[in-house]
Structure formats: structure tokens, C-alpha cells
Amino acid sequence: MTKRKSALSALKPTKKQVISSEDSDPEVVVVTNPPLDSPDAEESFISITEEDEAVRQLSTFDFSAKNTKVVRDETRGRSRVFHGMKFKETIVLRGAYVVTVWSGVIHINGALVNINSPVDIPVFAPASHALPQIEAAAGAPETRESGDEDVMEALHQLEGSSVIVEIAAMPRRSENPLITVSNFGKMSSGNIVPFVRQLWHCSEDDGSNYSRIYNTASVVTKSQAAVIPGIYDEWAEVCDDIRRLKHSSTMVVGSQNTGKSTFCKYLSAFMTTKKTGTSVAFVDLDPSNCEFTAPGQVSVTVIGAGHLSPYSILGPSFTHVTAPTYSRFVGYNNPKDDTRGYIEACKAVIDFAKGLKLPLVFNTCGWVRAAGHDLLRQLIDHVKPSDVVFTRDPGVDADQARLAESVKARSHVLDAPDAEPPRFTGAEQHSLQTVTYLHGGNLASHLSDLPALEVGLESVYVGILDSEGVDLADVALSTNSTLLAVMTMDKKTVKHAEITPDGLQYLPNFDIPQGECLGQAMVQFAGASVRLHTPVSASLLNAQLAADKAIVLVRGRIPLPVYELWDSRKGGEQAYVSFDVNSGVGSEAWVARRGLKRK
């Protein structure tokens, strides 16, 4: 097999033009990235690596001058790349990019995208998760209109293709409401979270070229073989079967890393994009791998018409953290730590979701054996689903079979797509989700530099889960510089509050939170006020206070990454860390103000 050239050539920025080739030059592929000092380095396009067998298997689209047209756009300061795809052809890219359909229909992660869909739909394909597959589908041949003559000329040259799609790099900064990550350039730099530098590399050895990490997406190589099909036939059949029910209620059950959350997003996108105006309620009952919130919560999020767009969830959970419709705080990453509290929180969320009168999609936790089997049985009895989808795991097939026999619902058993072992540990993924949440999706600044809410101590109450034996004098020490849930409760639940020596209104022996969770915050007590680093808005808190609700800050056991407390660029005295330097070699130590010494 003859290898194709690695790129066409660098585009000249002097004038706008449609670039193509004669039919006699079929080996030419797309374009290179501009030099780092070029004006085009701000926002470039797709680069193509040399072909190997893995590209053939995953990306069946054959990049050539016949099916790829490049338009130089001076107004946008970049080049635009259009691809004409045949029916069932696929493109798999690694990186972060935006997609616009100009003609026909494509599927991405179960979502149907056509000319009536938004432009610049964001797709996040990091190394930590299975890669989305763009697949050309059957659809009407209408073409999206453009006032740009050169764009229309490029579309004309691609006539005869089943689909014409434009793929561009994710912009560093964007006002696109579908892009919940507000500053992708900083997010991909490891500016705050050290290990995210590994997320967007186009290959294992190009990490030194920073610009290519966020300015390019690359065709996958042999080392990235985990793929989410654009329209997986087995999954699509189950999704279509569920969609036809008027009031479907679907629970997805399986052990960890078998594709539960992936299928839940797939089903939600399938249902809400297959028919215009459809909404679903995504009920997340997995406090460890939360889809839309920080870890430690169970929640309901409405996806679809007038709510969260299904086109904004085409990526891992940390790329679309958002405020849920309703949430309860569990306080632990693992339901094993407090099964009673977990069940109570789940039941409250389930009851709220049922009241929405929408199709329901339930993502469950990965605890399916022993006591976890009984816990799932309780949840299924409370939900009374129309369908239960089991993601196959040979190690727990017997447990799933027993559960399937006992449920009064339609059962479906799915094989998960082939996947590689997770690149990051569970703890690292929890950290990434937590940090992205606290920063509101913007990692351009350290958390201590972002504006915080300041609330008087008289307006808040403090509780600590499983706090038996905590002395009143130690409450501030136990909660300062930690991650606390921000909850709203009826005032009658806080009548037994006690005042600590620091002036905090403390709820002793705090058990199960019986109120809505508005979000989470890193807390710092400062004199007569408390400072909250949180994406929860001041207007929301003021509305709760105006409604005569109590604001309760609850500490569970959700870890906070230490790099959220310490900005290594500053040194010296900081808001959450103090430095004490004594004489002698090795005597320097830093002390977090929560009272934990680290040498």
C-alpha cells in the first residue's frame, strides 16, 4: 500500500481561495498547521497523520483532494475545511473540535445532526475516554445556505456526497452557548490541573508542542482504539425501541467501566434529536462518576427543548458540567459508605424526576454485587421502570441474570464497544470533575483569584456528616478550606443549632441532609463572614434567603485536590496555605490551614 503524504501544504494567508487539485493527484490530503508565530496559530484546523491500519479500521473516510476542500477565510483569520462523505463513512478524531453539517445527516454519540442543527457543535475527544465517531447517515439532500461565495463554491464541488461536513479546531475562547468550557485554551494547558496536559496530545510524543494540543485534532493512531460509534446498530435498535414508548422510564445497570454513562448520554441524545421538541430527564444516581455535577451528588438534569442542548454533551462529563434541575447531596463518592443516606437521596431525586412527566433515563452506580445487588433492587422497585438495560460484564453476568428475572420490565442486554483500560485513575477523574466544577468550566485563573461570594455567619448553618464526637471548638478547623455542599432547607430543621466559639451556627450530629443541594463550594471563614468559592450564583442564594429558607453548608467526605489550595506561582503567604521556614536543611514545611501538616 502506498502511504499518503502527511499534509498538502501550509496555506498562504494573502488571499481567500478554494484549494483543490486535479483528479490526477489523489494522494494529496488536508492541510498543515501554521507556524506558531503566524496569525493562523490562534485558531487552525485538522491535521492528518500518516495512515496505518488503525486509521483504516476506525476512520473509513479516505481524505483526498476529491472529497476535501479548503477555503481561506480572512474574516475569521483561519482556513475552513469541508469534507464530502459517502453513506456510512466514518471519521474518528482525537482532540477537541467543532462540527457543522452543510448537507445531509451525521450521527455523533447517538445524536442526529443535520442542516437544522446548530453550527459549530463542540465535540471533545480527549485521551482519557473513548473517541466519538462521526458517521454519515441517510438523509435529505438539502444544503445549508451561506452568504460566502467561496464557501458555496466549495459545497458545489462536493455535490454528490451523502454528507458535507465542516470540521474546525476548538477555539481557545468562544461565546458559543453549546461550549460549556469557557476557555479551552487554558483548560488544555495544565494551568491548574497538572495531568490534563496529557489529555489533548495528538500523539504520545508531541506534548512539547503546546499549540498543537489545543489547535488541532488528529486522526487516531494505533494506540487509541476505543471508539463510540456514531450510530451503533445494537444500541440504536434498543434506543429506537425505548423511544417509541410514550412515557418511557429506562434504568441502565452494570458494573464500572462497562459503558453505562456512555449509553445514557447516547440514549438521551438519540431521543432528543430524533424528533424536534423532545426532552428527557437524565437522572444520575452515580455519586462517584457524576455526569453534570461535582462528585458526591445525585441529580436530575433535563436535556432537550428549552433546556440543556443535547449537542452540548458530546464529550466526557468534565466538559459539560452544568447546574442540574434538581440535586441531593450524598456526601460520599461510594454508596457503600452510607447506603441509607444514599437510598434516601436517590428516592428524593427519583420522585422529583417522576413529577416532570418526561421520558426518564437513569444512570446507576457500578456496585452490582452482594449488598449492591440489594441496593439496586430497592431503586428498581422505587422507579418501576419500563425498561432495564444491562451492560454486559462476564464477571457479574450471574448477578445480572438474577436481577433481570426479578424485574417487571423489558430487559435489554448490551455489549459495550471495545475499550482500552482507563488512562486516568478514578481519583484523577474525580479531581478533574471537581476542579472543572469549582472553576465554572474556566481554568484560566487559579481558584483563589476568582471572585468569591461572601455571606454573613448569621445567614448560614454548618453541618458535618457523621460528626459524633466533634468538639464545638473544632468545627471551624474541620470545615475551613474544605469542600462543602451548599444546601437549602426548611428552617424548622435547624432549630437545634449551637453556636461555636468562632460564631458558627453548628448543627451537631448531622445525619442525612433533607434538602435540595444547590452546589458545592470551597469554604474559608473570615471573621464575621464566610467566603464561598463556588459557581452557585449570589442571586440564587439571595432568593433562598428571601423565601425564608436556611442555607446549610454540609461537609461530607469529598476530597479537594491540594492544588486548589496552593498556587505554586505565588509562593509565600496565601489564602489557604501558610509557610513556616526554620533553620537547617530540609526544615521548610507548608501547612494547609485545615490543620493538616505536610513535610
From Swiss-Prot:
Function: Polynucleotide 5'-kinase involved in rRNA processing.
EC id: 2.7.1.-
Pfam families per record: CLP1_P
Binding site for ATP: G254, S255, Q256, N257, T258, G259, K260, S261
Cellular localisation: Nucleus, Nucleolus
Gene3D superfamilies: P-loop containing nucleotide triphosphate hydrolases
Main location: nucleus
PANTHER family, sorted: CLEAVAGE/POLYADENYLATION FACTOR IA SUBUNIT CLP1P, POLYNUCLEOTIDE 5'-HYDROXYL-KINASE NOL9
The keyword Nucleus is annotated on this UniProt entry: yes
InterPro entries in UniProt: Clp1/Grc3, CLP1_P, P-loop_NTPase
Keywords annotated in UniProt: ATP-binding, Kinase, Nucleotide-binding, Nucleus, rRNA processing, Transferase
One GO BP: cleavage in ITS2 between 5.8S rRNA and LSU-rRNA of tricistronic rRNA transcript (SSU-rRNA, 5.8S rRNA, LSU-rRNA)
Keyword Secreted annotated: no
One GO MF term: ATP binding
Region (Disordered): 1-24
Signal peptide start and end residues: none
Name under which the protein is recorded: Polynucleotide 5'-hydroxyl-kinase GRC3
GO cellular component labels: nucleolus; nucleus
Family: Belongs to the Clp1 family. NOL9/GRC3 subfamily.
